[in-house]
Regions:
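The two-metal-ion catalytic cores of nucleic-acid processing enzymes
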Residues: 1-391, 395-396, 400-432
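Positively charged, low-complexity/disordered segments
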Residues: 434-439
Length: 439
């Protein structure tokens, strides 16, 4: 099979049967789908683990088992570790849950790292990286070489086209009469009527294919628009491929394929849905709609992405490069999640075992210390319910502001490399808790 060498950028990374689909933007401007064989893994550690039980579990879960070692996160010592390599990316989560049930969460390491991030750490191909790849005509990557660093300032990248999909009017569409759908690309607005049914869906697909945007921005796309479109398409049995159809190097050049591709899903261009969730943060119950992502094309719900609203596409590109999280997922996460991903990547490169669950207890604090210092002294949690005459103190970006103005971070408090500096306010033991500002 003829080999091909290409230069370009890693547009997106997603799991496929037996490996990862790498959507690649060539220097010529083509977006093609490549395939990289890859099997993610997780580790089990602990003196109580029995080899016979581990091998039996690996056989049941169809995982490859190997003995190795790693650096313990807490002690810094090198300890034995057992590596479970799963058959494919989709089986990582189920296998980890089985291992947690069988051996306990304290035995698991490197188990909460997404396949995409594991792939980036193993190969160096991170989202939006510039790379040279050597692949077969069917898209199977044989070798790859990264040509830049995620830390490069103002790293060059291709221009990205954007289209907007929304309903007419303002406000949440679920709270008013259903209005026509608007598709805006290249400054031109097209209106589509829901009552046209199957023709409405086919026209939407035609508009998306003709504009071929790299980024499809929606308003309320995750919690209302895309679920409604998918439900309508399912009821009318009309395909709704809003993502890109996988095209291999052979497809682009016009050459015949020599064998079936392993790229993508059984339904090319399909919309991939996730899980919705609710959580409590500082006394507020927050709902996060299920993410709806596209293959080979980015989908960002402007109403479900704090980062997109604050930084736009350039900010998402930068954070995706730095964190190793694919852009569609980083758009729906917090800056803290991206920072954690950067820390995990650093640990993996250093051979440090990342605990599955946090198990390092905090230093003891008395009741008085907790009142003064815990959560900055803010210990009041509002009673759930409807209230009137409510006042709110909004500390926008409080923690980043403290880090920026006063250089406060885990690396600068009680560090061993500097003399004690300014005492941290309100901490009782001021001799031992200091901020070192010389970093």
């Amino acid at each position: 099979m003829p080999r091909r060498e290409m230069n370009g950028w890693v547009f997106d990374i997603a799991g496929s049967p037996g490996g990862m689909t790498v959507w690649f933007r060539t220097a010529a401007g083509e977006t093609i789908a490549l395939f990289a064989p890859f099997r993610p893994s997780f580790l089990l550690v602990g003196n109580r683990l029995k080899e016979a039980a581990l091998r039996a579990a690996a056989a049941r879960w169809k995982c490859d088992l190997a003995r190795g070692e790693g650096i313990d996160f807490l002690s810094g010592r090198t300890i034995p570790a057992w590596s479970f390599t799963v058959p494919g990316p989709a089986l990582l989560g189920p296998s980890v849950r089985k291992a947690e049930k069988a051996f306990g969460p304290e035995a698991l390491c490197n188990a909460d790292i997404a396949p995409e991030q594991q792939f980036s750490c193993a190969t160096g191909l991170y989202p939006l990286s510039r790379a040279a790849v050597d692949c077969d005509g069917d898209g199977t990557i044989r070798s790859a070489r990264v040509l830049d660093s995620p830390w490069d300032v103002d790293a060059p990248h291709p221009s990205f086209s954007i289209a907007l999909l929304r309903t007419e009017g303002t406000g949440h569409p679920a709270h008013r009469r259903v209005r026509p759908l608007e598709f805006i690309a290249d400054g031109v607005t097209q209106s589509l009527l829901w009552e046209n049914g199957a023709d409405f869906l086919r026209e939407l697909v035609r508009l998306v294919e003709r504009a071929d945007p790299d980024l499809l921005v929606t308003e309320y796309g995750d919690d209302w628009l895309l679920p409604r479109l998918l439900a309508l398409a399912d009821r009318l049995r009309v395909p709704l491929p809003l993502g890109r159809i996988p095209r291999t190097p052979d497809d682009v050049s016009g050459a015949a394929r020599n064998r079936a591709t392993r790229i993508g899903s059984s339904v090319p261009g399909r919309v991939r849905g996730g899980r919705e969730r609710s959580f409590v943060s500082y006394g507020r119950v927050i709902f996060r709609a299920a993410p709806h992502t596209l293959a080979g094309r980015w989908h960002v719900d402007a109403r479900n992405s704090f980062l997109f609203g604050e930084t736009g596409l350039p900010g998402l590109v930068e954070l995706s490069r730095l964190s190793g999280i694919p852009l569609q997922r980083v758009a729906r996460t917090s800056p803290g999640t991206a920072i954690s991903a950067m820390q995990v990547a650093t640990a993996l490169k250093g051979g440090i075992l990342v605990p599955y669950k946090k198990r390092e207890p905090e230093a003891f604090k008395s009741g008085v210390d907790l009142v003064v210092t815990d959560k900055g002294g803010l210990t009041y949690l509002p009673r759930p319910g409807a209230h009137e005459n409510v006042g709110e103190l909004d500390f926008a970006s409080m923690y980043p502001s403290l880090m920026d103005r006063y250089n406060i971070s885990p690396e600068t408090v009680n560090c061993a490399c500097c003399r004690p500096g300014l005492p941290v306010p309100s901490i009782r033991d001021r001799k031992s808790t200091h901020l070192n500002s010389s970093h």
